[in-house]
Every structure is written in C-alpha cells, then in structure tokens.
Amino acid sequence: MLKEYIEKGGQRLRLGYTTGSCAAAAAKAAVLMLFTGQEVRHVRLMTPRGIELILDIGEIRMQKRTGESSSLFSCEDIEGSCKNGKTVNKPPFYSAVSCGVRKDSGDDPDITNGALICATAALSDRPGIRIDGGEGVGRVTKPGLDQPVGSAAINSTPRRMIETAVREAMEAAEACGEYGLEVTISVPRGRELAAQTFNPKLGIRGGISILGTSGIVEPMSDQALLDTIRTEISVRHSEGMTILAAAPGNYGKNFFLEKYDFSIETAVTASNFIYDTVQMASEAGFTRMFFVGHIGKLVKVAGGIKNTHSQYGDHRMEILGQIAEETAGSREAVPLTLKQELSDCVSTDEAIRILKKYSLDKQVLHEMTNRIQLVMEGWTKGKMRVEVIVFSNVFGELGKTAKAEAWISELRYETGRRGGSPAGGEPGSWKQGWEI
C-alpha cells in the first residue's frame, strides 16, 4: 500500500497508483522471471512523478521452453553490450511469463480500484520490445485519442513506463543479446469495467484504458478530469462535428432526452469546469457550442463565475437578485424586499417560485439565459458562438437563446450522420478514474 498523502479541503487523503504503473510493474516482474527463472514477489518502480513504488506481484504463470537448455555462458560469447564478462543466462529460462499487480487508487473513487492488471512477457523472433493490449484492454476505433486507430488503449506515458521497466529488468537479469520481446497487457475484468467508463463513448472498445501521466492517482484530481474533457473534445472534433454539445453532467443530458426525445450522446461532460471546457473547445477549433445545464450551475456563469463548484462560493441568489432588480426596474408591484426574499432561498427552485409570485420569472430567466451566452462567448473573445438551454428539475425548460432550436436540428443531423442514436440510449457514463 502506498503511504503518500496530500491535504485537500481539510482532509488528509492517500495517493494511489495508476493502471500504467501497475502495467509497468507487472511487465518488469514478468521479464525478470523470464530471464532469471526466479519467482519475483515484489518490484520497485520509479514513477514519472518521482515517487518510488514497491508493488506486490501475484498471479504468476510460467511457460517453459521446450527442447532447449538453460545453459550459462560468458558475455564474451555475445555480440553486444554486456557488463565486463559477467555470466548471463542464455537462452532464457521460460518462453513466456505472466503476472499481475492489483490497482490501488488510494482515497480516490475509481472504477478500476482493486482491478488486476496483468502483463505477459514472451520471447519473439523479431528484435525489439513490442507492447500490445490483450483481453480487457480497450482498442481505439476513433481518431483524436492518444493512440492511433487500431492500437491498444495504452497511452503514451504508460507505454514509455512499460518499456523503461522492461529494459531495467533485462539489465538487472543481465539478459544481453538481441532478444525480441512481446509484452501484452491484459485486465481480466476489463471488459466489464469499461462499461462503467467513458470508453464506449470515446470509441474505445473491448476494455479499459491503461492511463496515467504521473504514475500516481491523486484523489479527486482536477487535472485528470480536465484531461478527460480535453480528450472528449478532441474526439468530437476528429469526428467532424461542427457543433460541440456540452453539459455539466447527466442531468442535462437526461433533460434533453426527455424534452426533445433526442439523446445528445456526443455531449462533452464539463462538470464544474465550464470556463475550461469553453476555452478547450475554442482551442480545438470549434466555432460553435451548444450548452444545456441546470439553473443551479449556469446561473453562476451568468455572474461570470468560471468554476461552478461550491468551494469557489455560491452566489446563486446574489446573481439572481441582481438580475431581478435590473429587470424589474421601478415596477410598483415589485417589493423592495425582493432581493432579500431571493437571498433567503435555499434552492434555485424556491427562487423561481418567488419570481413567479411577482410575475418576473419569464423576464428574469430570459435575461439570465442571455447573460450566460454573452459570458461564454466573451471567454473566447468572440471566436465561438454559444447557444444555451437552462432547465430546472421541477419547472422544466426555463430559457433558451435565439438559435438554440435551429442548432438542435443540426445536432440531430450530425448525430445521425456519425451513426449515433438521435433518440433513446444512455445519455452518458462515468470516467475511468482520476489517473494523472
């Protein structure tokens, strides 16, 4: 168990390690056993973050070589770069060795926590180290991801970690010479786990991804979630989508399905990172974004708030009160206590009831929706047009901008063109975890 901690929100949270670290450690152990014939129960792995891991190795399986001996011979017999005449094993003791490492996500709510990540190291007639995915590791079917179409969903950093670990193992085992190795990463429950991740939506089929840029899982990492959002945006752009649909979460997608009988399965899940999502969409080359969200989050955007998480402040009622005051003007029917009444509200639905009481709901919500649009477009300095729909779970659709309906028609067409489901289907899924 990794005993490294961070302080976040007044809590002491334990770090974990990524699927990439597990794969690299398993590969290192498998190669050590392949060339030494000795069981390996623990390996050391230095992560890109600079934290050294000592990981337990299990599920060891060895396949013996047939018809060959494991004789020892001198380094002088090898054309290559062995160390000063040391005696080395040739040929290797086994033709293939597989083993596994259990993923430990620390205090992070990760789908893959406890999953067994396996590596099989096998001799090959071709020189070099080749890394591929086996059962339970996804296969890339769409452009725009870290790996090209057809490749195993083992991202760049884990691939480098695996190759480095394999070379370290060969050096430690004094395995000199031109050995070819096939390293296959597999996850026994990967196909089942993948159904609970974003992978099906991203076009990664058949299993989970092997992820991580630092080798370490940081509980509730903002950066990991931002990386996922950026990846989703990149995939949508590569698919040729001209309008990027986005929503803070599944509430928005579910509302859209119920209201318009249309599943925006291509919608990027922005979570609380509204500003970052808008910026990344613009940077990716999108010039149009369609955003649907609950008033509880989007009213904050109307006030210019970039991250809608409560840790950055609430301000919902203050913003609604300001808009109501500016919209109502000097109407006699509106009491001077309106802002205070709104300020006393606990929920936005309660605030809407107050606005309805004074027949201000339509005006205020219309103005709020337009301000959301203006703020989002302002974030891109006019490089991207944004259409918005705001809803409430109690009151339904509260407001939409001028061209929202027209863009919905375009989204229907684009979703149908890419082979999606314009109606029905699951509106979204959860990400694999906050691996960074």
List the predicted regions and their residue ranges:
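Generic N-terminal targeting/processing segments that precede catalytic cores or assembly contacts
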Residues: 1-67, 73, 77-196, 200
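A structural signal for small-residue-enriched, beta-sheet-centric alpha/beta enzyme cores
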Residues: 2-6, 14, 202, 208, ...
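Cationic, low-complexity basic patches in intrinsically disordered or flexible, solvent-exposed regions
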Residues: 65, 427, 432
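Ser/Thr/Pro/Gly-rich low-complexity, intrinsically disordered segments
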Residues: 69, 74-79, 418-428
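Flexible, glycine-rich phosphate/dinucleotide-binding loops
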Residues: 192, 253, 395-397
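Extended hydrophobic packing segments that form well-structured cores
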Residues: 369-420, 430-436
